[in-house]
């Protein structure tokens, strides 16, 4: 076994980003700066849920990874498959142990999110559209968990809704982008089943719904710092229109949506901090 493989299988860069989004969810909901202890706990619970999910995903995907990603820890023999399972379970347990310090609601929410990461890797991942929705739900759950960690939801609820909708759109675009490889692997993604054009239209619908939803925080008095959301909406609309006109633009579109999501999170944070201004 390779010691570094236990870090590698977590995919720490992704988990750190998820933890930061959890913290941003706390800040947006709190409309200020909560205690460092709570922010630290939110970060760790989100990080461990993400890392456990990545580990268990590699456990279930071992046969596919032997073909597509042979350099990953399990296929190359750096971590025995059974050890990876135990390692994932350990991370889940550590995360839940920490979540209890944030209260019952935060603990139960973490338990549900952790369970979804396991079920997704085990059964949902290959299912057309359902797998896309599961990923989007987990993405949306991150800022909500941050909000629960500080005892209120507030504007983080609107952030979560927008995150869910835009990530359904993005996940479908990613499936359009990967259609050739997925067909060779015998996968049954939405674009393979209904075609790239129809899948692009569904992706576009979720993009437009995101833009519509982004106006809801204005009704509850979000601050002027929310103004960059106009740029976000323009980026989402352009990507949504482009993918319908030309499904081959899905690769560029999903990257655009990723950048737009980051700007949106910052917009929500600035809007929360300037509320009443």
Curated annotation (Swiss-Prot):
GO CC terms in record: plasma membrane
Keyword Transit peptide annotated: no
Catalytic activity: sn-3-O-(geranylgeranyl)glycerol 1-phosphate + (2E,6E,10E)-geranylgeranyl diphosphate = 2,3-bis-O-(geranylgeranyl)-sn-glycerol 1-phosphate + diphosphate
Cofactor: Mg(2+)
Nuclease listed as a keyword: no
GO biological process, one term: glycerophospholipid biosynthetic process
Transmembrane segments: 16-36, 40-60, 101-121, 129-149, 153-173, 205-225, 257-277
Residues forming coiled coils: none
InterPro entries hit by this protein: DGGGP_synth, Prenyltransferase_related, UbiA_prenyltransferase, UbiA_sf
GO MF terms, alphabetically ordered: geranylgeranylglycerol-phosphate geranylgeranyltransferase activity; magnesium ion binding
Keywords assigned by UniProt, alphabetized: Cell membrane, Lipid biosynthesis, Lipid metabolism, Magnesium, Membrane, Phospholipid biosynthesis, Phospholipid metabolism, Transferase, Transmembrane, Transmembrane helix
Origin: domain of life: Archaea
EC identifiers of the protein: 2.5.1.42
HAMAP family documented for this protein: DGGGP_synth
Similarity field: Belongs to the UbiA prenyltransferase family. DGGGP synthase subfamily.
Stated role: Prenyltransferase that catalyzes the transfer of the geranylgeranyl moiety of geranylgeranyl diphosphate (GGPP) to the C2 hydroxyl of (S)-3-O-geranylgeranylglyceryl phosphate (GGGP). This reaction is the second ether-bond-formation step in the biosynthesis of archaeal membrane lipids.
Name of this chain's protein: Digeranylgeranylglyceryl phosphate synthase
Naturally occurring in which organism (per UniProt): Pyrococcus abyssi (strain GE5 / Orsay)
């Amino acid at each position: 076994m390779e010691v570094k493989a236990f870090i590698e299988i977590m995919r720490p860069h992704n988990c750190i980003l998820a933890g930061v989004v959890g913290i941003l969810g706390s800040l947006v909901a709190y409309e200020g700066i909560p205690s460092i202890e709570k922010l630290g706990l939110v970060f760790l619970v989100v990080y461990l849920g993400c890392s456990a999910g990545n580990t268990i995903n590699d456990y279930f995907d071992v046969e596919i990874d032997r073909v597509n990603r042979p350099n990953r820890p399990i296929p190359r023999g750096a971590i025995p498959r059974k050890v990876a399972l135990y390692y994932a379970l350990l991370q889940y347990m550590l995360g839940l142990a920490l979540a209890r310090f944030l209260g019952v609601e935060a603990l139960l929410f973490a338990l549900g999110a952790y369970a979804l990461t396991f079920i997704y890797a085990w059964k949902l991942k290959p299912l057309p559209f359902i797998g896309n929705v599961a990923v989007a739900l987990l993405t949306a759950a991150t800022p909500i968990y941050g909000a629960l960690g500080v005892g209120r939801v507030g504007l983080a609820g609107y952030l979560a809704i927008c995150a869910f909708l835009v990530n359904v759109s993005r996940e479908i675009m990613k499936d359009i982008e990967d259609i050739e490889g997925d067909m060779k692997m015998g996968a049954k993604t939405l674009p393979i089943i209904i075609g790239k054009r129809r899948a692009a239209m569904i992706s576009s619908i979720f993009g437009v719904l995101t833009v519509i939803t982004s106006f809801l925080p204005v009704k509850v008095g979000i601050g002027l710092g929310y103004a960059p959301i106009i740029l976000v909406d323009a980026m989402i609309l352009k990507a949504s229109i482009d993918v319908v006109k030309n499904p081959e633009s899905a690769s560029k579109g999903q990257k655009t949506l990723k950048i737009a999501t980051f700007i949106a999170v910052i917009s929500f944070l600035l809007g929360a901090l300037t509320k009443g201004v």
